[in-house]
Structure formats: structure tokens, C-alpha cells
């Protein structure tokens, strides 16, 4: 069985990293794309008036491939801590983990629709990104709760 202190220490560092990921991810998204779907669309589709070149399929693929590995590994590592907690039910754990993976996949793939001039994918990108960040925040909150639940019980 895992010692309570060791679990709490590991969870503390994981929570700190999730928090850092949330803040830096939001900051980078806003800096790079902006807040509005129209800004996201212009970033990927390009705008000659503002000298913004359109992104290519190959360029998006070069970005997507490392994101697949990084994001899936991040979700796996943090969700793995969730499996050791008893704060929420198994069904809610399944829903949270599934929703994280689905929102990440949609976030990664939505620029492909934008470069082929489907403006709806700019909205999809924004919604998927904010959903992913919100769900990571929920995961952070649940793990934070689990830290106190576990230590108060032991």
C-alpha cells in the first residue's frame, strides 16, 4: 500500500504542474490565437491585409503529432492519480477522463477544418480548448480534494 505522506507529496507536485499547465496553456492560447473565433480563424486561414500567412496541412501535422504524445501522456499521468482517489464515483472518473481525451482530440484536429475554410471549426477550436482547460481544472480540484480527504481519513 502507498504511504499517505508519499501519496500526498506526489499529488502536491502533480497539482502544481496541472496548475502551471492551466495558466501557461491559457496564456499561450490568448497570446497566439486571441480570444475570439474570428481571431483563431485568421491565425490558421491567413489574412493578406495583416500579412498573416495561411497555415499548411503539413505544418499543422508537424504541430499535431507531438501534441498527441504530450497531451495524451499528460492526461494519462494526471488521470492515473484520479484512479487512486475515492472522492468521485467510477462513472464520474470515466466521464472526466473520456471528456479530457475527446476535447483534446477535437482541439488538435479543428485547425484542419479551418485551413479548408470552414469557419465553424474556429468556434470548435475555441470551445474544445476552453473545455479541455476547464476539465483539467476539474481534475485539479478533484485531486486537491482527494489530498485532504485522504490525509484526514488516515
Predicted regions and their residues:
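Cytoplasmic juxtamembrane regions at transmembrane-helix boundaries
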Residues: 77-100
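Individual transmembrane alpha-helix segments
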Residues: 54-77
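Perimembrane loop-to-helix junctions flanking transmembrane segments
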Residues: 38-55
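N-terminal signal-anchor transmembrane alpha helix
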Residues: 5-35
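Hydrophobic alpha-helical membrane segments
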Residues: 95-111
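Membrane-interface helix-boundary signature
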Residues: 3-10, 54-57, 89-96, 115-125
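Alpha-helical transmembrane segments of multi-pass integral membrane proteins
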Residues: 108-154
Amino acid at each position: 500500500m502507498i504511504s499517505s505522506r508519499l501519496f500526498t507529496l506526489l499529488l502536491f507536485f502533480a497539482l502544481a504542474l496541472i496548475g502551471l499547465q492551466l495558466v501557461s496553456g491559457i496564456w499561450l492560447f490568448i497570446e497566439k490565437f486571441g480570444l475570439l473565433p474570428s481571431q483563431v480563424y485568421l491565425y490558421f486561414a491567413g489574412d493578406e491585409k495583416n500579412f498573416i500567412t495561411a497555415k499548411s496541412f503539413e505544418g499543422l501535422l508537424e504541430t499535431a503529432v507531438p501534441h498527441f504524445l504530450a497531451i495524451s501522456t499528460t492526461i494519462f499521468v494526471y488521470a492515473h492519480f484520479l484512479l487512486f482517489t475515492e472522492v468521485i464515483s467510477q462513472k464520474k472518473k470515466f466521464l472526466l477522463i473520456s471528456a479530457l481525451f475527446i476535447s483534446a482530440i477535437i482541439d488538435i484536429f479543428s485547425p484542419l477544418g479551418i485551413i479548408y475554410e470552414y469557419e465553424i471549426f474556429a468556434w470548435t477550436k475555441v470551445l474544445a480548448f476552453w473545455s479541455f482547460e476547464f476539465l483539467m481544472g476539474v481534475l485539479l480540484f478533484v485531486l486537491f480534494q482527494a489530498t485532504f480527504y485522504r490525509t484526514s481519513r488516515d
